[in-house]
Structure formats: C-alpha cells, structure tokens
C-alpha cells in the first residue's frame, strides 16, 4: 500500500501521489467497515449503546468552528463559505493524541463504529448514518451536525460509539476529537437490511453505489491544478450538515463546506438511492485567487489493463479496471466513446465543447468472465454519469491518464474545465446531476462501442504496425445494409479498413491497421455511417508508444 499524503497540501511532489493513493484509503473504508446494519428486530449480542446525541458544546477544549448549534437554512453554508473566503486561508491544526496519529493500517482497521449506535437507528427512517474515526491516513478533524426543523446540532465525538479490537493497545480518547468522515446506509439491496449507500471521507472525496454495486470509482468536490508540474491542490470538506430524512421520503440531503488555499465553497447534495443512485449537486465557489486550472464535477478511477492494451502486465486476470471508458455527449449532438489506457507516460487529453450535455467514466464490461476476480468483482463497479444543469458554456472535458503498475492506485481523472478562469472575489454557481450504477446513461444510442482491442498487425514477425478491432453493439434489429466506416488519424498511415457483421454481438466489427511511422502519439477517430439516421457512438483513441 502506498503512503497517502494529507491531500489538502499542494507540495510539488504531492500532486499525483495523493490522487493515486486515495484509492487505497477508500478501499480501506469499504472493506474495514463493511458491516451490515441489521433491522431493529435483530437484537445485537453486544450491549446496546444509544445513538450519539448532538451537543451544543464539545466535550473538551477543541473549538467548534463551523457546526455550532443554532438556526440553519439553505443559505447557511453559503454564508459561511463567503465569510471564509473573505479572509486569508488558515491551516487548521487539530493534532491527534500521539497514539492515534501514528496508527498502523491494522490498528486503524481495528477501530470500528458500533452499528447499534447508528444515527436514526430504531426510528423507522429510510436512512441511517455512521461516522469514521480519525487516525492513520485520516488526520483532519471533520465537523458534523444534524439538521432537524431548521435547527443544526453539533455532533460531538464520544469513544463509546466505537469498538476497538485486540490490535489497539491504547484507550480511545474522551475528548471531542471530531471525526474523519461518515457514511450513509439505506435499504438499497434488501428490505430490512441497511447497506452502505455513500461515503464522505478524505479531502473532498466521496463515493456512492447503485443497487448491486461494489465501491469503485470516486468523485471529488473540486479539482485544482490536476497534473500540474507545480503540484495539485486538494480542497477539503471541513464540515457537513446532514438533514434528518422524513419517514416517507427516498431523499437525504447533505450540505458541505469546502476550503483550500485558493477557494472556499458551499455544496448541497440531494441523494436518491436506486438502481442508479442519483445525486443532485448544487455548488457555489468563492475563489480567493483566480482559478485558471479548475476542474468541475471531477471523477477519479482506476484502469490497469484490458484487451485494449496490457503492455508487459503479468496477470492471470484478462482485465482489471474500475472504469473502461470516458463517454461524452457534446453540445453538437455527438456521442463520443474514448477507451481508457494505462500509458507509459502521463497523458492529458482535452475534448473541447460548448454546453456539454453529459460525460462520465463508465464501466461498460459487465461480464465476470472478463475479469475472473472472485474478490474484487470489477464487473460490479458502478459507472458515474455527470449531467450539467443549465448551460456550462465553453470549455473542455479533460481526461488525465497516469501510469500505474498496481490496481491500488487511482490513475484516471476526468472533469469539466471552463474555458475562462473564475475570477478572484467572484461567486461562481454551478449544478449537475450524478448517476451511479450499472447503466446510468439512458439508452438513446442505437449503436454503441462494446469492445476495443489492439495488438500486433503482422503475424509472421513483429513490426511497428498495430491492428485495432472495435466491436459495436446494436440496440435493436440489425439492418440489411452494412454501414460505411470512416477512420481518421492525426499521423501515421491507416490501412486495411474492414467492416463486417458480428452476429455474436448483434452488431458490427471494425478492423483497421495503423502504421505509426515516426510518430510517438497519434489521435484516432472512427465513425460508422448509415443511410438512415441513427445515433451512433464515435470511437476516439490515443495511441502512444
């Protein structure tokens, strides 16, 4: 496991490492704390501890900075963010007791939230909530408040809400040391069983699940200076306000306060679980400085290898990835599919657009046979689709692909980058809908890319020439006609373009060869043309040495 930086720092050496290492941290949050919260009638064998009671004052000298008990409304976090941004950035220092600050991986795993102490347990509500302890990678103090009837009540830390196993040698502190994050549970998969639905933990990272999913890719509140040579900046959600859900609602609302050296922000997450869990995000940014390298609606994922290119990977599994492609619906009505890659060198691609209709990192391959992993079950990882609300104007969908040799590293980042910088001192509002699940995108396409593979073109001997095979699937009956295939490249020579029916896939197979010549990087584009109008995905690809 890699070392994880604190992720609110922005040292030159930290930019990529922090982004990569968070996948290991989130793997921890999903495996070390993956108990099921049982329904009320299943009485636990351990003594029942009453759910945490929010208190007006912390239990120790630590100051409650943001989640003070008092009146709360929809503008409360916006006002806090505006006030925070009007002052210079302050590094908050909330040191943990030495024993907690230096916890090992196994020790931190041994501190678990006691499910019988879940917020709203035994109240018959559709949601429950559990908090994460501070320690190990998660050093920052995160404040949490519960909101009910327009009143926010600070949720103080108490050690009795956690259980410590035999690995922990010291007692948990009695002081209000805060939390490192929280997770929301819901009867997502089975009536009467509260499964994990969503997690907020680490910088501005969060994750969610659709029905039947296992945790995979992550989202962030904001991306700043991603892949910048001077280092990436990682904003942090410093405080959360969670609204008590109603009995008959399938909605839970979370408010969050974001902070970093460059910007403060207010976020509102409206979460609706389902086959594809929907999260409506409303955000207002208050930049302290001009934001010229900003990413809105960022997603972070992992791609190690697939049939698309294994390099020298020595792995019994055919494919290993949380996502296998970037899907984009642009403002011109095109639907674009860009397979992901694990390049030998850092690659950044920008897809210019005006008023994007949607984009997201998609896990399209859903067959177990493609992964053969009995533990990871990559076929269950959710896709994440982003739908902008309103006109986002000019900018680009940016895709960053980072070399990695291990699946514990997140090495894929995507986001929307506005064309114009966001001025210092301004208020920048944007909104979007997130859909997490197996099929979060409506099947509006009649022809979609189902598989991309590449390999050497010359069977007799190795040559630089590459063979590409792109399979298309039809949603509906296959027409009698064969489409025309158009393949373009930014360099090299395209040869031997062939299009054929693929009955096994209810679609077509496009094959062609690329002679790179002296190029080290070539952009490829393939389109299928039908005589009758059809919505057909355009295939994009970046070939590199």
UniProtKB/Swiss-Prot annotation:
This is Glucans biosynthesis protein G. One of its GO terms (cellular component) is outer membrane-bounded periplasmic space. It comes from the Bacteria. Involved in the biosynthesis of osmoregulated periplasmic glucans (OPGs). It is found in: Periplasm. One of its GO terms (biological process) is beta-glucan biosynthetic process. Pathway: Glycan metabolism; osmoregulated periplasmic glucan (OPG) biosynthesis. Transmembrane segments: none annotated. Its main location: periplasm. Residues 1-34 form the signal peptide. Keywords: Periplasm, Signal. Gene3D superfamilies: 2.70.98.10, Immunoglobulins. One of its GO terms (molecular function) is catalytic activity. Residues 38-60 are annotated as: Disordered.
